[in-house]
From Swiss-Prot:
It is a multi-pass membrane protein. The keyword Transmembrane helix applies. InterPro entries: DUF1980 (IPR015402), DUF1980_C (IPR048447), DUF1980_N (IPR048493), UPF0703_membrane_permease (IPR052955). PANTHER family: UPF0703 PROTEIN YCGQ. The keyword Transmembrane helix applies. Belongs to the UPF0703 family. Pfam families: DUF1980, DUF1980_C. This is Putative two-component membrane permease complex subunit SMU_746c. Could be part of a two-component membrane permease system responsible for amino acid transport under low pH. Involved in acidogenesis, biofilm formation and low-pH survival. Disruption phenotype: SMU_746c-SMU_747c deletion affects biofilm formation in a medium- and pH-dependent manner. Mutants show a reduced ability to grow in acidified medium, but they survive both short-term or long-term acid stress. Mutants have lower glycolytic activity. Deletion does not affect membrane proton permeability.
Amino acid sequence: MIRFLILAGYFELGMYLQLSGKLDRYINSHYSYLAYISMALSFILALVQLTIWMKRLKMHSHLSGKAAKFFSPIILAIPVFIGLLVPTVPLDSTTVSAKGYHFPLAAGSTTSGTSSDGTRVQYLKPDTSLYFTKSAYQKEMRATLKKYKGSGKLQITTQNYMEVMEIIYLFPDEFKNRQIEYVGFIYNDPKDKNSQFLFRFGIIHCIADSGVYGLLTTGGQTHYQNNTWVTVSGKLAIEYNQNLKQTLPVLHISQSSQTMQPKNPYVYRVF
């Protein structure tokens, strides 16, 4: 009976995350089919366990000892309780500060690329090179650059946010003096009051490889508070940042306006 309840709990957890829209805060929305597969398997296995319990069938068990029989169901049930009871809070600039984010320094620095809790994080530029061979990655990025190369206004949307940010950092000269417009939340640079980052939290595959991506902005007439969602438009320049000790693409804002937070504040990498 306990096995049936645990498996039914996994099915209900999947339903809850899907119907509440919270599943998108854990995995790339393009992988939601995996959640449906998991729900279907949990439901089928739950029915199997219910049948075994009702017919009182004797099944072979590899568990030996009272401690193993006691703790194994508890361990399996923990994710269900966490998923159902722990509130899901969207990541924002408070998270950026609380996790002790330090933006990447120039090559050769001693910064390890991990946050204060020991997890690997990505900053500013999405990096999908880990998922390709070197030649395949270069080919993929060149093909992506070809899609957005030009002199007209570049509109960065929720759908293309991750791939556009990646090629802007890889090929900044191709976008120099280009008019760019996009939406993000404000994160004030603690070391420079005149500079603000405009970010979105992005997920490549799941929350474990998530990062905060966007551009350093300057020149805006209005100084916004942290977590303010803003639509900005301006020209991209390439400048050396003294604090980060590297050359970065910087958006010189010509227009900005406060906007509502999107229903889903996250962006996802589409492959």
